[in-house]
């Protein structure tokens, strides 16, 4: 049995963006919205959706005449729900007759993480399955995790980007799982301040 180094898990995870679709189950008059609702943009010759920007929380919604919306920019599920409620409330305040409850479905969560370790990407590329690492093309290792089903871009600095999650818990699970796997494969070492090169 090999000696697995004792490296503490000190990862910091940040949700950067949540993209969700919202179904309103009714057709919408985007021209009426453009005339009534302030601070929206609608130019059907350029793009078929109406652009609705919120300042707090800072999200953008693309609203289509089919009653579908794409909401992007939220940093948490709670913020996403708050944004959708605020959009619906604003549309109703300006005379839009919206019936029914919106159905929200998260399509993608993008997160960043810092493992606070140095990752040996050459070794990880050799030992991990489902990965792609071509340092001449891109400095990070692309790892496709099966459970949860996410893609991780892992850098030698211990920083990473996670995409494809549908729930925030999946992001945290994926980061912990890849950390444990990298430790098990002896692909990480503690981050030392003096190792920084300027």
Curated annotation (Swiss-Prot):
Keywords: DNA-binding, Repeat, Transcription, Transcription regulation
Biological processes, Gene Ontology terms: DNA-templated transcription initiation
Entry function: General factor that plays a role in the activation of archaeal genes transcribed by RNA polymerase. Binds specifically to the TATA box promoter element which lies close to the position of transcription initiation.
Family: Belongs to the TBP family.
Protein's UniProt name: TATA-box-binding protein
UniProt entry tagged with the keyword Transcription regulation: yes
NCBIfam families: PRK00394.1-1, PRK00394.1-2
Region forming the signal peptide: none
Segments annotated as Sequence repeats: 15-91, 106-182
Annotated organism of origin: Sulfurisphaera tokodaii (strain DSM 16993 / JCM 10545 / NBRC 100140 / 7) (Sulfolobus tokodaii)
Lineage: superkingdom: Archaea
GO MF term (any one): DNA-binding transcription factor activity
InterPro entries: TBP (IPR000814), TBP_archaea (IPR033711), TBP_CS (IPR030491), TBP_dom_sf (IPR012295)
PANTHER family in alphabetical order: TATA-BOX BINDING PROTEIN (PTHR10126)
